[in-house]
Every structure is written in structure tokens, then in C-alpha cells.
Curated annotation (Swiss-Prot):
Quaternary assembly: Homotetramer.
Gene3D superfamilies listed in its UniProt record: 3.30.60.20, P-loop containing nucleotide triphosphate hydrolases (3.40.50.300)
Family designation: Belongs to the thymidine kinase family.
Organism encoding this protein: Streptomyces coelicolor (strain ATCC BAA-471 / A3(2) / M145)
GO CC, any one term: cytosol
Catalysed conversion reaction: thymidine + ATP = dTMP + ADP + H(+)
GO MF, one example: thymidine kinase activity
UniProt keyword list: ATP-binding, Cytoplasm, DNA synthesis, Kinase, Nucleotide-binding, Transferase
InterPro entries: P-loop_NTPase, Thymidine_kinase
Disulfide bridge positions per record: none
Pfam families per the UniProt record, alphabetical: TK
Protein name from the UniProt record: Thymidine kinase
Length: 216
């Protein structure tokens, strides 16, 4: 039976790499897929991983009907044996419903990949709807690590290396930002709560300690 599967995790856990691997494995067996993405770091209409792999994809726009897009492709004689939706956290809840309809009405597997929570530890609406509708939710087993070495469970937004907790939910950035640019970093819960990024931890380590008073 076709399924709607949601592969979730923090940044740096290999979601897009797995999406590309699924695409490779199925296309190598002669299957035809359709790839959706939104706001990928490589630019519009691209699915990319941090390992440097990239392939073309359909850039999803606001209000776009994903079910209608698949049906239109089929009606023009195209094949769709599976659908991959990367950066699924950025999709609207209605678009997640449309992906579920692709599974139920067209008998096509849909593999969605996304981050569950934003930099404030709040669920993305698209991810929330996927958790509600998916036949399976798979938490990726490639663990991202906090700067302290603990398992990273939270996504932090940074400006110049300093964690921020206000702003729009969706701002495209990367983990390799230059000073004063918006970036993202994965943290363990403890350091997310303390708002301690790798940059602020380094700054604290380099700060001169108060010297002990010595007896004269």
C-alpha cells in the first residue's frame, strides 16, 4: 500500500541526503519521481544536501495545489511513481493535505522530509500537519551534535553567532554564515535554553577569569 512517510530531524541530520538517495535508488530501477522543494539553500528549484549533491526540483509557491500539479503531469502522459517533498516544514497545511490525497487517490508513495520545530522550539505548521496525517513518522538516526558533543535536538537561529529568539518563523540562512549574517546552529536542549551557541561558548572560554587573591 502506498504511504505518506515523514522523515524528520534537526538540521544537519541528513534529511536532504536521504531524499537524494531515495531518488537515486528509485530512478536507477526505472521509476519516475516528482520532487518538490521550497526555499532550498541552493536556490529556487533545487534539492541539495550539505555533501554537495544537488538535483532539479519543482519549487513550490504560495497557494500552489500539489495534487493538481501531479494530476496535470499525469494527464499530459507523464509518469509519477513516487513523490519527494523536501523542506516540507515550509509547506502550508493545505499542501500537506494535498500530498496525502496523492497517496490516497493516486496510489503514489510520498516521502516528505523536514525539520519538526523552528528556532523557538515551536512546531512548523507543515510539520505539525505531517505528524497528524503521515502513515509513518521516521526520526532520522544520523545524530546531529551540539557544540558540546551532546545530541542536538533543537534548531537555533543566530545573528553574528549570537542566538536570537524573535523574528519571522521562516528566514533562509545556513550553518556557514559570515559575521553579522543570519545563520542556524543545532544545539542540545540545555544550551538552547541557555542560548549558548558555539560562538558564545568560545567567547566565554576566552574571557579572562578573575584571578584568585593571593596571600601576601
Amino acid at each position: 500500500m502506498p504511504e505518506l512517510v515523514f522523515f524528520s530531524g534537526t538540521m544537519d541530520c541528513g534529511k536532504s541526503t536521504l531524499a537524494l538517495q531515495i531518488e537515486h535508488n528509485r530512478s536507477a530501477r526505472g521509476l519516475a519521481g516528482m520532487i518538490f522543494t521550497r526555499d532550498d539553500r541552493a536556490g529556487e528549484g533545487k534539492l541539495s544536501s550539505r555533501l554537495g549533491l544537488v538535483t532539479d526540483a519543482v519549487e513550490v509557491g504560495d497557494g500552489q495545489d500539489l495534487y493538481a500539479h501531479v494530476v496535470d503531469h499525469l494527464s499530459q502522459g507523464g509518469r509519477v511513481d513516487y513523490v519527494i517533498a523536501d523542506e516540507a516544514q515550509f509547506l502550508a497545511p493545505d499542501q500537506i493535505d494535498q500530498l496525502a490525497r496523492v497517496v490516497d487517490d493516486l496510489d503514489v508513495d510520498v516521502y516528505a522530509f523536514g525539520i519538526t520545530t523552528d528556532f523557538r522550539s515551536k512546531l512548523f505548521p507543515g510539520s505539525q500537519r505531517l505528524v497528524e496525517l503521515a502513515d509513518r513518522v521516521e526520526v532520522l538516526q544520523v545524530e546531529a551534535l551540539c557544540w558540546c558533543g551532546a545530541r542536538a535536538t533543537h534548531n537555533a537561529r543566530t545573528v553574528g553567532g549570537v542566538m536570537v529568539v524573535e523574528g519571522a518563523q521562516v528566514v533562509v540562512g545556513d550553518v556557514a554564515q559570515s559575521p553579522d549574517e543570519i545563520g542556524y546552529e543545532v544545539l542540545c536542549r540545555r544550551h538552547h535554553r541557555r542560548r549558548m551557541t558555539s560562538a558564545t561558548a568560545r567567547a566565554a572560554a576566552l574571557s579572562p577569569d578573575v584571578l584568585p587573591v593571593t596571600a601576601t
